[in-house]
Amino acid sequence: MERIYVIPLRKAKNVPRTIRAPKAVKIVREFLMKHMKADTVKLDESINEKLWERGIQKIPPRIKVKAVKDEDGVVEATLEE
């Protein structure tokens, strides 16, 4: 199964400045676990670089992700261009 999601990261703006980027990574992972019904989510390095490109405090408001679920139920997510 392959899907493209636009994941909102507004909830990460409501945490202290110094933990916004790590919180955004958790939000992306939890979003994909919920919507793809998977227990294991592997995030590509490109997603991590996009969330951290402006530092820990200034995260993007949303991120576009391509998620692919294999037969084992593992979701691999990459940044959609």
Curated annotation (Swiss-Prot):
GO molecular function, one term: structural constituent of ribosome
Family matches, as InterPro entries: Ribosomal_eL31, Ribosomal_eL31_CS, Ribosomal_eL31_dom_sf
SUPFAM superfamilies: Ribosomal protein L31e
Cross-referenced PROSITE patterns: RIBOSOMAL_L31E
Residues passing through the membrane, by range: none
Disulfide bonds: none
Domain of life: Archaea
This protein's UniProt keywords: Ribonucleoprotein, Ribosomal protein
Biological process per Gene Ontology, one example term: cytoplasmic translation
GO cellular component terms given for this protein: cytosolic large ribosomal subunit
Listed Pfam families: Ribosomal_L31e (PF01198)
HAMAP family: Ribosomal_eL31 (MF_00410)
Family: Belongs to the eukaryotic ribosomal protein eL31 family.
PANTHER family reported for this sequence: 60S RIBOSOMAL PROTEIN L31 (PTHR10956:SF0)
Protein's name according to its UniProt entry: Large ribosomal subunit protein eL31
Protein source organism: Methanothermobacter thermautotrophicus (strain ATCC 29096 / DSM 1053 / JCM 10044 / NBRC 100330 / Delta H) (Methanobacterium thermoautotrophicum)
